[in-house]
Amino acid sequence: MPSGLIVFDCDGVLTYNHSSWQQLHEYFGSRDNKYFAELYERNLITYLDWMKIDIALMIHSWGKPIKRRDVENALSTIRIKQEAPEVIRALKDADYIVAVVSSGIDILVERVCRELGVDLCLYNKLAFHNDELIPGGEALVPLREKPRIVKNLAESFSISIHDTYYVGDSKWDIEVFRNVGHSIAVKPCGEACGFAEHVVSDLREIIGIVNGSRV
């Protein structure tokens, strides 16, 4: 019987970079147009619409087809936080199921999950045709859908949402914080800091928080 479920966001939580999407925009020379984020936030476009727009902007700015290798190169400089392996190992040794639920990009999130050895990893998938990036993909973790996804994940392991931990860092994580039993925000976390049960500067603090809740 597992001790519980601990779900991590990826960008800015397990990595030093706060947005893999922003990383791609900067690499390919496009503007990360906040206008489309606002349209999504207002429920005027879907997350897949937003993905298509972002990718189209990147391709247009790059001025030539973007290959899978280009995307891999763009994301290769994003590093996993130094303390992350120690924390994930300690949580797994304590019999917690460790999952990542990220609205980031599969090529990065898969690498992070593989290197850290997490139990389950959910993310959005880019679309390639003959190794060429095309607008589209699979929006498996839309930002607004995170509360539902985390709840369903807990239920799949027969773990109460009230016994579930969620670790995030942005305004998009606030609704998840409100729904889980234990919420942890990782600095810098902006307005999300005010909605979490715990706020940490170093991931290693999570070990003490989890151990303390078991006493």
Placement of each model-derived feature along the sequence:
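Acidic, Mg2+-coordinating phosphoryl-transfer loop and its flanking beta/alpha structural elements
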Residues: 98-103, 162-201
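Short, acidic loop-to-helix structural element flanking the phosphoryl-transfer center
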Residues: 72-100, 104-106
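Short acidic-hydrophobic, aromatic-tinged amphipathic segments that line or gate anion-handling sites
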Residues: 122, 198-205
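Surface-exposed amphipathic alpha-helices with a cationic face
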Residues: 85-93, 146-147, 151-158, 178
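Short, charged, surface-exposed secondary-structure boundary motifs
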Residues: 129-136, 193-199, 208-213
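Substrate-recognition "cap/lid" segment bordering the active-site pocket of phosphatases
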Residues: 111-164, 171
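Metal-dependent phosphoesterase signature
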Residues: 53-83
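Active-site neighborhood of HAD-like aspartate-dependent phosphohydrolases
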Residues: 1-52, 56
